[in-house]
Amino acid sequence: DVFDRIGVTYEVYGGPGNCCGILQFRVGDAETAGKIATSTIDRFQNSGAPDVVAWCPTCHIHFSEVALPSVSDEGAPPFDMHMLPTYLADRLDQLKPHLTRSVSKRVALFEFPGARGVTEAVRKLMNAVPGVEYVDLGIEHAGYQMSALETVPDYRSKTIAGVLRAAEENNVDVLCSV
């Protein structure tokens, strides 16, 4: 709906048929991961779109840092990859006329800094919503998503508890995970 409102022409790709190959890559099956990623890249390239927008940080990181550089012999990838928040923040002028309802809330982010520019983009988008007050919880950030912390369960548990405590201490109305 948001893309429709700001006049973006798009096609939706998703599911296992459009996978980045990260699951195979993580367990050491680079050959299968490469085939999956290359097949998906070919589908994206054949669409003719200059931009591919991902909502999944793992897909974005894997395509941008591993798969696309591997298939781009001439250096330039066949399209630009964007995370959804950065794509929308880059089009904030088109989006602002649609942000008309005041949302009187104190909002904090449980953010993961691994996907470049995402946290900044989300803050920029939040600040554009009338009535939203961004609250910085002043906490340490690690990983690129909560599942990245599964190998350090004690740290993960302490992080979650710390975020919830900080949100309560700062009288946050909404705690968003990014």
Question: Language-model segments: which ranges?
Answer:
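Iron-sulfur cluster-binding electron-transfer modules in prokaryotic oxidoreductases
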Residues: 1-178
